[in-house]
């Protein structure tokens, strides 16, 4: 089955072609970072308009790269949520229109299920069951995964997601959008130990997260430095390192608890923050200490992309899942509501 995947949940337009027998044939992405940077964050209306502009050229691009024609496509998968409603509607409308014109099925895919399954595109994919850490700008969740659609939420953030905390903290100390990569870059030059941040909710049982306090701690620390006349680049580096260490150690502690609670030794990390090198290194060390394994997608598939949507949609279509031509998207969509395969 040859599936065209469309991703438009936020500020990246992703298109890919995935074949159930040959694997990923082509993948293209247009990022709107430059468009939104001047505003310090994503402007939903601008995101939607840019998706409209980029979608059809990217579809033509992946068809050319794969050496395919439209008549060879068996189905279309598109992101139906969660995300920005206007942006989601661009992908959904395009998918359903093409599906109607080409007389093929279209299926809406859960954005975070796409992220969760992205490591399945790698040469050494994880086997079920496993624990997944979904960590992005909008989500921080620990999930037990027994199969596609078989999800048990173990814990999640009570306030800011980890990626959101990265971006907000970066903005507070004067870094460019998107803030996560900027903090990671500066952290490489930071002096360990100059600042010590708390590890929120690690001193009590449970698998919930809270990152809003770290953002406040960073702001107060930065203001103290500025009041003392020290708002140098090195101070930004030191603060970035301390903040990143706090987030990474908190995530690692909770992942270790989740593995112990479930009795599993396979961990998948997915979502934009899973590209963070410090987080990967910390989780690899932790899994090594318990003789377990950690899995993640290549960096280009950690952020939003069409390949993960094409793959997830293909699995559900092969299992016989069907959908009518109604255009329906959801800004919020608990993953536990998905039907199991």
Swiss-Prot record:
Record keywords: Acyltransferase, Cytoplasm, Iron, Metal-binding, Transferase, tRNA processing
Annotated GO CC locations: cytoplasm
Pfam families: TsaD
UniProt catalytic activity: L-threonylcarbamoyladenylate + adenosine(37) in tRNA = N(6)-L-threonylcarbamoyladenosine(37) in tRNA + AMP + H(+)
Sections of the chain in a coiled coil: none
One record GO biological process: tRNA threonylcarbamoyladenosine modification
Keyword Oxidoreductase among UniProt keywords: no
Note on cofactor: Binds 1 Fe(2+) ion per subunit.
Subcellular location: Cytoplasm
EC numbers, comma separated: 2.3.1.234
Cofactor(s) the record lists: Fe(2+)
Keyword Transport: no
Molecular function terms from GO: iron ion binding; N(6)-L-threonylcarbamoyladenine synthase activity
HAMAP family reported for this sequence: TsaD
Function noted in UniProt: Required for the formation of a threonylcarbamoyl group on adenosine at position 37 (t(6)A37) in tRNAs that read codons beginning with adenine. Is involved in the transfer of the threonylcarbamoyl moiety of threonylcarbamoyl-AMP (TC-AMP) to the N6 group of A37, together with TsaE and TsaB. TsaD likely plays a direct catalytic role in this reaction.
Family named by the database record: Belongs to the KAE1 / TsaD family.
Record's protein name: tRNA N6-adenosine threonylcarbamoyltransferase
